[in-house]
Design a protein with these regions (language model features):
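Acyltransferase/transacylase module recognition
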Residues: 66-158
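Alpha/beta catalytic cores of group-transfer enzymes, especially the acyltransferase/condensing modules
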Residues: 1-90, 94-98, 155
């Protein structure tokens, strides 16, 4: 079993699955002149049907939880858009075994008028994907106190 697990940006996909199947896809990509094929060190076949058991476990766990009305919209990257409150448990349950539509999510945000994105966490990988999707987006990265202060100043126009 192998499937596309992440649609990052134009020209970049991530596949995941059983090790041998992933190796076969890697070989096929290279044979068909893929510009670059990189093996990622992950701890599991995330966002694939191989995580169905984890998805079912989440479903059972969520039956014990109370979900409240969202105060701000959340774009679920399994769908690439917002959802209704009552769908949250089902979407979260499916998220572990469904592909991530990062590019679709960013394009949806742009269609909603978003022109600034702040990446929080180490590195600038997601910002690089956003640049490949739409170079007009203003990007900031926060990974420590210094970059937080710099971003706050920039957003205040200082």
């Amino acid at each position: 079993v192998v499937s596309i697990s992440i649609y990052n940006c134009p020209g970049q996909l991530v596949v995941a699955g059983e090790k041998k199947a992933v190796e076969n896809v890697k070989e096929l990509a290279l044979e068909n002149k893929a510009r670059r094929v990189i093996s990622l060190n992950t701890s599991g076949p995330f966002h694939t049907s191989l995580l169905k058991e984890a998805s079912l476990a989440l479903k059972e766990r969520f039956k014990k939880e109370t979900f409240h009305e969202m105060k701000i919209p959340v774009i679920f990257n399994t769908l690439g858009h917002e959802i209704e409150d009552q769908s949250i448990p089902e979407i979260l349950e499916k998220q572990v075994m469904s592909p991530v539509y990062f590019e679709k999510s960013i394009r949806y945000m742009i269609d909603q008028g978003v022109d600034t994105i702040i990446e929080v966490g180490p590195g600038k990988v997601l910002s690089g994907f956003v640049r490949k999707i739409d170079r007009s987006i203003q990007l900031y990265q926060i990974e420590d106190m210094e970059s937080l202060k710099k971003t706050v100043k920039a957003l205040k126009g200082e």
